[in-house]
Design a protein with these regions (language model features):
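An amphipathic, aromatic/His-enriched active-site/gating alpha helix that lines ligand/cofactor pockets
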Residues: 25-37, 56-90
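N-terminal first-folded block
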Residues: 3-40
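Short, well-ordered beta-strand segments in beta-rich or mixed alpha/beta enzyme
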Residues: 3-10, 40-67
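Glycine-rich beta-strand-turn "strand-cap" elements at beta-sheet edges
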Residues: 41-49, 77-100
Length: 100
């Protein structure tokens, strides 16, 4: 069953310029993983420092494999130095989809 991971994290706006290259690296590495259909971050235009997260995974096994990657470990280890906080991410199981 397809999984969607969606939510937000916060980063102090003054750290965004230094943090963006890490987001780009994480997106590229994650998108290359088997089972990843989509992986992205978006900065909220109305609330500086609020980052929206969207991921799509083939199944739970693919998501669990993602959590065990070296790039995920580096990503999480970098968070304290950039002040990443308020991690609010949720997984959704998708039973079906249709175009809107």
């Amino acid at each position: 069953m397809t999984l969607i991971v969606a939510g937000t994290v916060r980063i102090p706006p003054e750290n965004l310029d230094r943090f963006r290259p890490h987001m780009v690296e994480m997106m590229a590495a994650s998108r290359a993983e088997d089972g990843c259909s989509a992986y992205g971050y978006a900065e909220d235009v109305g609330e500086p420092g609020l980052i929206h997260v969207f991921e799509q995974w083939r199944d739970q096994a693919a998501l669990e494999a993602h959590f065990k990657t070296d790039h995920m470990a580096r990503w999480r280890a970098a968070w304290p130095g950039f002040g990443v906080s308020e991690r609010r991410l949720f997984a959704y199981e998708v039973a079906s989809e249709r175009p809107l």
